[in-house]
Regions:
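Short, low-complexity, Pro/Ser/Thr/Gly-rich segments in the mature regions of secreted, periplasmic
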Residues: 195-205
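Hydrophobic/aromatic-rich core segments of domains that either
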Residues: 129-194
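Active-site nucleophilic cysteine motif
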Residues: 89-93, 123-138
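Linear, non-domain "peripheral" regions
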Residues: 1-74, 143
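Alpha-helix capping and helix-loop boundary segments enriched in small/acidic/polar residues
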Residues: 1, 63, 122-125, 149
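Secondary-structure boundary elements
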Residues: 64-119
């Protein structure tokens, strides 16, 4: 089982039947991987913005951001291999996030569900938490990624997702709704999304 030291990550009872057990500072958390690996993260060094006000959670304190960083580094060490293409890296991060987080039906205001902490540490998030978590994972594995918020013209003005760069092109990625590498035409047609594109890279249309 994994051994991660340096930060405390609480157990999520609702995940017990879905994942194998791993020990974190004497507490059990759950993972979809059963491969035995030992990881010590006393001082996580994975790349990303873990300062206060980060896109990973603008109001998360340094302790919560440190927990996010610990999980992100564990993901990178366990799942990302030398020589992987950006496509494989993004697909791995996408599947990891969808396997280790479920939708927070109670609302965004519970358990930091609109942050990367909710998605990666607590295991529950709404769309904003999924998007912020995906941004953190992509930053760590060296894949260009943007965090995007819908505008008032969208079918759901509160919705949030990502844009990722794969193979020299930008695509829409929405881990919460299982949208993987979509073109803008597909995204607009299927989800009715609208967003301000100023400052964002131009995505593939198909």
């Amino acid at each position: 089982m994994h051994e991660v030291t340096g930060y405390t990550i609480s157990a999520m009872p609702h995940l017990q039947k879905l994942r194998g057990t791993e020990n974190v500072n004497g507490k059990n958390i759950y993972s979809d991987k059963s491969v035995a690996r030992k990881i010590t993260l006393k001082s996580p060094t994975v790349k990303g913005d873990y300062s206060y006000g980060s896109v990973y959670g603008p109001y998360l304190d340094t302790a919560h951001l440190a927990q996010v960083r610990s999980v992100v580094q564990s993901f990178k060490l366990n799942y990302i291999r030398k020589g992987m293409s950006d496509y494989d890296k993004v697909l791995t991060a996408f599947n990891y996030l969808r396997s280790n987080c479920r939708y927070a039906y109670r609302g965004w205001q519970y358990n930091y569900a609109n942050t990367a902490w909710g998605a990666l540490v607590y295991g529950e998030a709404q769309c904003s938490g999924y998007a912020r978590a995906m941004k953190a994972l992509c930053d760590a594995i060296g894949v260009d990624c943007r965090y995007v918020h819908a505008n008032a013209k969208a079918s759901n003005p509160s919705h949030q997702w990502n844009q990722v760069k794969v193979g020299g092109k930008w695509y829409i990625l929405d881990a919460q709704s299982n949208g993987f590498l979509l073109g803008t035409n597909t995204w607009i047609k299927q989800a009715g999304m609208s967003w301000d594109t100023k400052g964002l890279p131009t995505c593939s249309k198909t």
